[in-house]
């Protein structure tokens, strides 16, 4: 471990990122210092860079949340439990946002700190590149349900006839959204490009539709009515999903109160629908470390 390391530094709002040197930090009591081998890019990374959303309180900044690498050093309070010792392969949710913008956290650097609760072992059968896509994608997919009031221990049965629409199901977040929706017991209607339909079905979707089809709204509505299920819940995973989602819910929810989790940042003047709650899906770190990391561990261990 060197005294300094390379980092992709954001010097000011709007960027651009520049490679520079940073002092390699010592981990705090509850931190894990990780030698980063791979990172994943997420839409929130360019939101932070270009728009300061989530807020960036300190510049120069280091952004990025998803990291995979090797444990370099443990904080003094990190003993036992699920976090392995130095030299072990791990994945981590290392966002600086949840650490008041501290640039010692943030995935886009060679050595990054992460809270111990947000670090889990990386199975030997997964590469660093494969492991890096897990943290934020899984957490975002799971947080969507609790954001709209669906506990993660929900288990609908076929008799409940509860359905959900996932728009953008072949993305990293969307693929985990499909799998978690099936675990909750939903009948899952999903959209994706035709080349991804078989994959999305294997993940658990009951029906998959081409989002570019000019008749996609009517086709989903017809399928829901034919199947005799109740569709008044949705997760908009990608930009541009909200209006067609609301068009579908307008025809399927009846008099029921509908709920939509929206993972991209909501535009200021976004479309609305009567008797429908539309909520920006934003994970809080308290929720992450208390209720979701165990779910992430189980998801990774199954790979």
From Swiss-Prot:
Enzyme Commission code(s) on record: 1.-.-.-
- Name what induces it: Expression is positively regulated by the azaterrilone A cluster-specific transcription factor tazR.
Q: Which Pfam family would be a valid example here? A: ADH_N
Which residues hold substrate? 136-143, 265-269
- Pathway noted in the entry: Secondary metabolite biosynthesis
Residue ranges for the region (Disordered) are 1-26
Q: Which UniProt keywords apply?
A: NADP, Nucleotide-binding, Oxidoreductase
| PANTHER family to which the protein is assigned, alphabetical | HYPOTHETICAL OXIDOREDUCTASE (EUROFUNG), ZINC-TYPE ALCOHOL DEHYDROGENASE-LIKE PROTEIN C2E1P3.01
Functionally, this protein is described as follows: Trans-enoyl reductase; part of the gene cluster that mediates the biosynthesis of azaterrilone A and other azaphilones, a class of fungal metabolites characterized by a highly oxygenated pyrano-quinone bicyclic core and exhibiting a broad range of bioactivities. The first step of the pathway begins with the non-reducing polyketide synthase tazA that assembles one acetyl-CoA starter unit, five malonyl-CoA units, and catalyzes a series of Claisen condensations, methylation, PT-mediated cyclization, and finally releases the first hexaketide precursor through the R-domain.
The record's family statement is: Belongs to the zinc-containing alcohol dehydrogenase family.
The name on file for this protein is Trans-enoyl reductase tazE
Q: Which organism is it from?
A: Aspergillus terreus (strain NIH 2624 / FGSC A1156)
Gene symbol here is tazE
